[in-house]
């Protein structure tokens, strides 16, 4: 009925759900078959955009292996009208870049910083699919990445690898996070330096 009415529910008058974010925990700990089932169910329900929020590439980049990428390709072949967006969570360039014994980022002959091999391979696997977007979103955390240089390197290297920088945000103002939060004014300053 919703489809027959141009995306408007005939009784409630509301638009259909167009975008879904899979998050809350980490959906990338699910098996490929479970992810495929979720993706297909959402596509069949008429969802136009699926975002997958994950920190898994920082912890276990091998999860983004050939079989996972093949599952994504099959999904896209079946539902090409559905946008798929991988929303990665990297907070600091140390999570993606190699360092030498002195703690400096490793550069190649052209001066480009080198990714940690497994993470770089996973990123290339995702970013190499022109139909899928890869974005980074991260909190600004006191004592971790509240540094303009670190965020600049993170953004530059992520973009150079084929990703986009979605956004940075401040933590929620609750007791458990207070030690890690920075004032929004300071976040604004950092992002504009």
What are these regions (language model features)?
Residues 186-193:
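C-terminal accessory extensions appended to soluble enzyme cores
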Residues 3-19, 25-186:
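Conserved AdoMet/S-adenosylmethionine-binding subsite of the radical SAM
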